[in-house]
């Protein structure tokens, strides 16, 4: 089934951190707590005008004085105050949404599977052993100041270059990461909290995007 024919729910939230809770079988379950205050619909895209169906949602209150004129006009058209973060969710039921409509964490149900998209923690410049899990060079037997080096990165005059994609040292982390098929443990609609089994990308306080599982059954 194509994405255009599927119904999706996606919300922006803030990762608060991890904790442990007991389930109905008295098992200790590690969960990540995501705070999802109401997201508002700021635009509805239709196949007739835009070529596809989707909704644009906004999250995170900001001081209206800090919004530029184009953004202020965009939010005024939707009848909402300016927000800091915007994203689009492609869904087949886009016609059921209206400008200014609020979507709460209650859109997710316990036991269902979700995908979580976030930005991984930045590690700075890292070597190949940390960045790519290289084994390294022997501690002895002729190894002289080579213990954490990558070794050869290519041949000689043929091909006289380093191939693209060669795993080398460089900046690590700070990338978009998607974790698939995490199970929703519980939902606290009053406090706007979503508890997801397992870990999600990013540091505490970072923005994450939670959606229905694309590949989940």
Curated annotation (Swiss-Prot):
GO terms for cellular component: cytosolic large ribosomal subunit. Gene3D superfamilies: 3.30.160.810, Translation factors (2.40.30.10). SUPFAM superfamilies: Translation proteins (SSF50447). One of its GO terms (biological process) is translation. Keywords: Ribonucleoprotein, Ribosomal protein, RNA-binding, rRNA-binding. PROSITE patterns: RIBOSOMAL_L3. GO terms for molecular function: rRNA binding; structural constituent of ribosome. It comes from the Bacteria. Residues 137-160 are annotated as: Disordered. InterPro entries: Ribosomal_uL3 (IPR000597), Ribosomal_uL3_bac/org-type (IPR019927), Ribosomal_uL3_CS (IPR019926), Transl_B-barrel_sf (IPR009000). One of the primary rRNA binding proteins, it binds directly near the 3'-end of the 23S rRNA, where it nucleates assembly of the 50S subunit. Part of the 50S ribosomal subunit. Forms a cluster with proteins L14 and L19. Belongs to the universal ribosomal protein uL3 family. This is Large ribosomal subunit protein uL3. It comes from Clavibacter michiganensis subsp. michiganensis (strain NCPPB 382).
């Amino acid at each position: 089934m194509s994405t255009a024919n599927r119904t999706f729910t996606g919300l922006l939230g803030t990762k608060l951190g991890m904790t442990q809770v007991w389930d109905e079988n008295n098992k200790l379950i590690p969960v990540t707590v995501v705070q999802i205050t109401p997201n508002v619909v700021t635009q509805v895209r239709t196949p007739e005008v835009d070529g596809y169906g989707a909704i644009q949602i906004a999250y995170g209150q900001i001081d209206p004085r800090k919004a530029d004129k184009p953004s202020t006009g965009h939010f005024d058209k939707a009848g909402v105050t300016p927000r800091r973060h915007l994203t689009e969710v492609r869904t087949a039921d886009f016609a059921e949404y209206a400008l200014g409509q609020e979507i709460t964490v209650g859109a997710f149900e316990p036991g269902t599977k979700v995908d979580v998209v976030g930005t991984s923690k930045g590690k700075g410049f890292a070597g190949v052993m940390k960045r790519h899990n290289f084994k390294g060079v022997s501690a002895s037997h002729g190894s002289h100041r080579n213990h954490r080096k990558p070794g050869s990165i290519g041949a000689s005059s043929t091909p006289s270059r380093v191939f693209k994609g060669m795993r080398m040292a460089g900046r690590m982390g700070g990338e978009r990461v998607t974790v698939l098929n995490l199970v929703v443990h519980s939902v606290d609609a009053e406090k706007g909290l979503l508890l997801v089994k397992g870990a999600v990308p990013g540091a505490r306080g970072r923005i994450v995007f939670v959606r229905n599982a694309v590949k989940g059954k």
